[in-house]
Amino acid sequence: MASVHLTLTKAFMVTVFLTLLLNVSITRGTTQHTCSILSRPHPRGLCGSTLANMVQWLCSTYTTSSKVKRQAEPDEEDDAMSKIMISKKRALSYLTKRESRPSIVCECCFNQCTVQELLAYC
């Protein structure tokens, strides 16, 4: 009876192991970069001026869309107060929730990032 129990236990363990192995090889996940106050630069991360220069070079090399300067809103153009006041629409836009996305420093300095992640900051 003990040998039957031992055989079933071994068979169960092999089945669990193979299932986990297949799950790991089949599952394709996306990497999620996380940072905390204790994060330190990755040995192969891009930091400081190196990061800035790389983004500048990639953006100038691989993006074709030129940035168009925002036209001033008609009510802001001629008003002397336009330098210190903004429209209601713009003011309310600051109250909306920002997209929760790691910063470029978190993604590319404290972690190692891809060219596609760098291009997202163009």
UniProtKB/Swiss-Prot annotation:
Family statement drawn from the similarity comment of this UniProt entry: Belongs to the insulin family.
Tissue specificity annotation: Expressed in the cerebral light-green cells which are giant neuroendocrines cells involved in the control of growth.
Keywords in alphabetical order: Cleavage on pair of basic residues, Cytoplasmic vesicle, Disulfide bond, Signal
SMART domains linked to this entry: IlGF
Lineage: superkingdom: Eukaryota
Natural source organism: Lymnaea stagnalis (Great pond snail)
GO cellular component, as recorded: extracellular region; transport vesicle
Disulphide connectivity of cysteines: C47-C109, C59-C122, C108-C113
The protein, known as: Molluscan insulin-related peptide 3
Keyword Magnesium: no
Residue ranges of the propeptide: 71-87, 91-96
Subcellular localization, as worded in the UniProt entry: Cytoplasmic vesicle, Secretory vesicle
Presence of the UniProt keyword Transcription regulation in the record: no
Secretion signal span: 1-29
Quaternary state and interactors: Heterodimer of a B chain and an A chain; disulfide-linked (doubly).
Pfam families with a match to the protein in the record: Insulin
GO MF term (any one): hormone activity
